[in-house]
């Protein structure tokens, strides 16, 4: 496993060294074969990485990366090694009705480590980045006040970007207006709503695809609430969330062929271990308007199976394809949008799991 600091393009062991030096040193010591990846997370350089008492700034770890990359396992091991607690930073794992389809951490993990902001919200409740930031900052401060290390795990780029770099403070949308806009969309659909947006806010319409339902509705309701384009708020200074904290971002970046394999295997396991029954239950509990915007991969495909539009194999295959596409977008986003990060690269499961068996001595 390679640990790369993206600021310096160097690979980190006990001290920053070049990739060439890593292979040279390890070959001399007999640790690795030529061309093999280097060892493990415990060799990542900064001794103060996880120690909240070593400086005035308190540390926060953010463990990010594509779906099915091993974030939950790695985060759990870090929490055990460094007296940490886990905070969710995934927009779908907040919902209590769908722990299986969203691959939320297993109950066995939660008996060992405290987990926060997982599976607590009803699918019928509105949630937003602003609401997430409020809850997450409260949990971060509670955890550090207890002398523990906050470890945030997830793949929702908007949440991560807003927490680390700040956010544009768009006024809250009233519940009445939100309901009106959603009812309007249900009645007229994307194309006609986009046409209305174009007349009111041509800037937003020029930047939003007609098929992007979530962004389309959001832009329309923001204009109706504020009489301003949603994009006008992006020119304002961002409001910093946690200026007194030091963020350490670890990006898991598996080799693509291996990542796609783990995506397929995860979906297959999820389908076999209760996802069908889970989605069948919420299909009975909620009206269709309540779940049309649910974005978790697999929900739409399982609904199509339950409605008789796809066979089970077809639904699984469709969900696997969409998961791989989503994972690819996540990798691209994290590579391009988060510059100050440590990147962990690995090519197979054995390399990932074996390297993590060593102690995390110098993180």
Swiss-Prot record:
Disulphide connectivity of cysteines: none
Short name of one Pfam family: IPPT
EC numbers on record: 2.5.1.75
Alphabetized UniProt keyword annotations: ATP-binding, Magnesium, Nucleotide-binding, Transferase, tRNA processing
Residues annotated as binding substrate: 67-72
Reactions it catalyzes: adenosine(37) in tRNA + dimethylallyl diphosphate = N(6)-dimethylallyladenosine(37) in tRNA + diphosphate
A GO term for molecular function: ATP binding
Superkingdom classification of source: Bacteria
Annotated site location: Interaction with substrate tRNA: 156, 178
Sites where the protein binds ATP: 65-72
Cofactor annotation: Mg(2+)
Class of this enzyme: transferase
Annotated segments matching region Interaction with substrate tRNA: 90-93, 214-218
Stored InterPro entries: Dimethylallyltransferase, IPT, P-loop_NTPase
GO biological process: tRNA modification
NCBIfam families registered for this protein in UniProt: miaA
Task performed by this protein: Catalyzes the transfer of a dimethylallyl group onto the adenine at position 37 in tRNAs that read codons beginning with uridine, leading to the formation of N6-(dimethylallyl)adenosine (i(6)A).
Subunit structure, as described in the record: Monomer.
Family named by the database record: Belongs to the IPP transferase family.
HAMAP family, A to Z: IPP_trans (MF_00185)
The name this protein goes by in its record: tRNA dimethylallyltransferase
Name of the gene this protein is made from: miaA
